[in-house]
Each structure stands twice: as C-alpha cells, then as structure tokens.
Amino acid sequence: MNIMFAYDDSRNARFALKRTLDMFGKLQPMIILIAVVEQSLDTSSSSESNYLEAKEKFTTAVRETAESLGEQGFDIEVIIGEGDARKVILKAVQNLNPDLLVIARRSHEPDGNVIGQSIDALVEEFNFMTFGSVSSFLARRATCPVLIQACPAVL
C-alpha cells in the first residue's frame, strides 16, 4: 500500500500523520510525504532572503519527519515541490498513483512555526478562497481515494 501524505509541518499535519499511522501502520505502507513551498509574490531582496530562510527551515523539518518515519520502519519517499499546492499535489497523485491521499484539514488556529505564521497572515485575508480549497480541489480531482483528517482545536 502506498499512502501519499500532504505534509506542511503544521500542528494539524503532524497530528493527522500520527492518526494515519495509527490507522494504517500495521500494513507497513510506503509513505510518500509531499510538501509544497508556495512561491513568494514579493520580489524585494529582504523578502527573498526571508523566503529562502523559511524554505530551508521547512525543507529541514520535512526531512526530519521523514527520517523519524524511516526509523520507525516505514519506507519513505519525500517530494518537495514549489508553487500552487493544489496543482503540485494533484500532479504527484497522477504520476505516482498512490492508494490513498491524506490531507490534514486546515485550522483556524495559528500555527507556531515560521511557515505557519507567515501563511496564517495571508490566509486570513483570503480565507473565503483558501478555507478547504486544497482539500476541496483534491477531493474532486484526485484519481485515488482522499482522506481528509479533522484535527482537534487543542492538542
């Protein structure tokens, strides 16, 4: 079994990953962690350096999660894409044909990490567009079953 997990290192993603492994871990599935860095729209040099720093921290966090899963005995593949998360994940689903795609539902609670804080500020402005937009888009278009994990408000 191959499970593709859309991972953004948020509190909800970590919780959903744990729950997914609780549900499917005994099957020893291949876990494909797909993480997407959204490209910065601001082209100033300070913004670029902040973006690159945040991207590096995000990439490191994703790889550390993959390493931890590997230590638990799971076969892991990591894909780190850049761009529109919906399109990057959909293309990966179409190319890799996983048995299941897992997504953590977006939270209204701000996340503590750098990426989460940056994204949270933008999301509030475009909440009508972004609330569930990735989940909704992939649930309609993915060529495999999609599991959208609900997460508690407080862990």
Language model feature labels by segment:
Residues G70-G112, D120, L155:
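Structural beta-alpha unit
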Residues D8, S49-K57, V123-T130:
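Alpha-helix N-cap and loop-to-helix initiation/capping positions
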Residues D99-L155:
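Gly/Ser-rich helix-loop-strand patches that form or flank binding pockets
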Residues R19, E53-T65, V88:
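Short, solvent-exposed amphipathic alpha-helices that sit
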Residues I32-I34, E77-G81, L147:
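General small-molecule cofactor/ligand-binding pocket signal
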Residues A35-T60, V154:
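Acidic, proline/glycine-rich short linear motifs
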Residues M1-S47:
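Small/aliphatic-rich secondary-structure junction motif
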Residues D22-G25, K91-N95, R140:
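Solvent-exposed polar/charged
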